[in-house]
A protein has these predicted regions:
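N-terminal secretory signal peptides that target proteins for export/translocation
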Residues: 1-5
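Intrinsically disordered, low-complexity segments
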Residues: 6, 19, 29-32
Length: 237
């Protein structure tokens, strides 16, 4: 009998300690509408959708190791440091980009957030044994917007070559038509809530180890051998 009473007292004491612990207090405050909020986990480097050597010989494993493992990772790490302790902590990436676009006092946050998004989108714009032509609705929209697939390809490569300095070349949907646009540095169509279908990174770190100053050759390899048209088509609205 004494043993049972002792066990009961132990359980009651343990329960009381749990109820007043910081974890439970924060959870109760959050659920009751208090200003105290539980901070969401920081951003993490997203996994590549393929192995680092999967895009060879068009993009080498060495380039992918630096581009993904160093550059992309640095943007993620910088973003986490910059938003920590601010009203942007715990917000979705797209919201951070749209709230900081054009804000001079939040330029560093925008640049790193946009580059995290742009790079993640770039990886999913490619696949091993990609390229060729799209089919179905996407092909029809390309032919309607550019006259033919070959004209689209020429314009896309030319736009990427003409982009001065670092930046990105995009295929975006504008209602029932498609457009090729370029953005400088970290800028991104999502900042203007545009619907991007695919992108190619024309920062030098994306191609210089493999192509040196031959950006056109890199862009041509992208459209001929790497574009994931299924992924692009899935983004149509």
């Amino acid at each position: 009998m004494k043993l049972q009473i002792a066990k009961s007292l132990f359980l009651v004491t343990t329960l009381m300690l749990l109820l007043v612990s910081p974890i439970w207090v924060r959870a109760a405050e959050y659920s009751s509408g208090s200003t105290t909020q539980i901070t969401a986990p920081p951003f993490a480097l997203p996994a590549l959708p393929y192995a680092e050597n999967a895009l060879e010989p068009y993009i080498s494993a060495n380039t992918m190791s630096f581009h993904y493992g160093k550059h992309h990772r640095a943007y993620v790490d910088n973003l986490n440091k910059l938003v920590a302790g601010t009203d942007l902590a715990g917000k979705p990436l797209e919201e951070i980009i749209q709230r900081t676009a054009g804000a001079s006092d939040k330029k560093a946050i925008f640049n790193n957030a946009a580059q995290v998004w742009n790079h993640t989108f770039f990886w999913t714009s490619m696949k091993p044994r990609g390229g060729g032509q799209p089919t179905g609705r996407l092909l029809g929209m390309i032919e309607k917007s550019f006259g033919s697939y070959d004209k689209f390809e020429s314009e896309f490569v030319a736009a990427g070559v003409a982009q001065f300095g670092s930046g990105w070349v995009w295929l975006i949907q504008d209602g029932d038509s498609l457009k090729i646009v370029t953005t400088s540095n970290a800028d991104t169509p999502i900042a203007q809530r545009q619907n991007a279908l695919l992108t190619c990174d024309v920062w030098e770190h994306a191609y210089y180890l493999d192509y040196q100053n031959r950006r056109k050759d890199f862009l041509q390899a992208f459209v001929d051998h790497l574009v994931d048209w299924d992924s692009a088509a899935s983004r149509l609205k």
